[in-house]
Amino acid sequence: MGRRLPATITGLAMGFIETLNNIADRIEGCAAVIIFGIDGIPIERQVRELDPSADIDMVATEFTALVRRAMRTAADTELGEMREMVLVTDDMSFLLRPITTDYFLLMAINPGGNIGRARFELRKAQLSMEAEFAI
């Protein structure tokens, strides 16, 4: 992937793969789930039922602009921190949860997928990963 991660994150890479795999297994319609940094560079991913023409890494990179703007808007309006972002398109839904202010979980869900379950599973994963990413 080309990105050098802090030693604590590198040592946990297998744990991240397992976590993402478990999330994807529990959510009907999960196309992909990815951990990426605020710079848009993917750290780890699990791809399941993703259309071959869809590039989940590109989606994550593009999401960084939305995430930065949403975080800035939340701070500027004093509404608190951004907790979750949802984007629904004709072909796919995307759920995003911050792990920290610098790292995020993004899930792509195919039409008919279980968005409620996805929200629940991403929240659980976010809580379990917070300490691992707090460097």
What do the PLM-derived regions correspond to, one by one?
Residues 2-32, 38-135:
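Acidic, low-complexity cytosolic segments
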